[in-house]
Regions:
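Active-site loop/lid in soluble adenylation, ligation, and acyl-transfer enzymes
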Residues: 1-142
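A short mid-domain helix/strand-loop element embedded in enzyme catalytic domains
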Residues: 133-159
């Protein structure tokens, strides 16, 4: 087993048998920067959310999930500190996008809105204040950059 990748909040280990282990840490990442402070058990919460969606959508889209049960992990990952943080997955080719669901007028979306510009193909007819809840959430994908910053893209770009 070897470390395959170290991301902003996850560590990926290659079991060299067609499977990988992903460990979700308590690191905080904002605007593509890892912050020096950690949030206790943040990794467990992120992992639980990801596991929920992998399970919920498994009949809609295939995914890499094999198990999140600690007893199914290789011995090195069956320690208490890995409980709730690990998933065992199939080693597949990654589709290099992430999908962001935005429910509030904030960040780069708010900056574009203030200038009267559409945000990744989304136009807003209503007047919004910064951090105000949107009438309907919007989906804004971005690239999943191996290095450097992720880049916002449109759904059409992904097709």
């Amino acid at each position: 087993m070897k470390k395959y990748a170290s991301g902003k909040v996850r560590e990926v280990y290659d079991l060299e048998d067609g499977r990988m282990v992903i460990v979700t840490t308590d690191r905080i990442s904002a605007f593509d920067v890892i912050l020096p402070t950690m949030i206790t058990d943040k990794g467990k919460v992120l992992n639980a959310l990801a596991n929920f969606w992998f399970d919920y959508t498994k009949d809609i889209v295939k995914n890499h999930m094999i198990s999140s049960d600690l007893k199914d992990m290789p011995a090195e990952f069956q320690k208490p500190e890995f409980a709730g943080r690990t998933i065992l997955v199939k080693k597949l080719k990654m589709i290099p996008y992430e999908v962001i669901v935005r429910g509030y007028m904030f960040g780069s979306m708010y900056e574009a809105y203030k200038k009267g510009e559409p945000f990744l193909g989304h136009k807003f007819e209503k007047e919004y204040q910064q951090a105000e809840k949107l009438d309907e959430p919007i989906v804004t994908p971005s690239t999943k950059a191996a290095e450097g910053h992720d880049i916002n893209v449109t759904l059409d770009y992904m097709k």
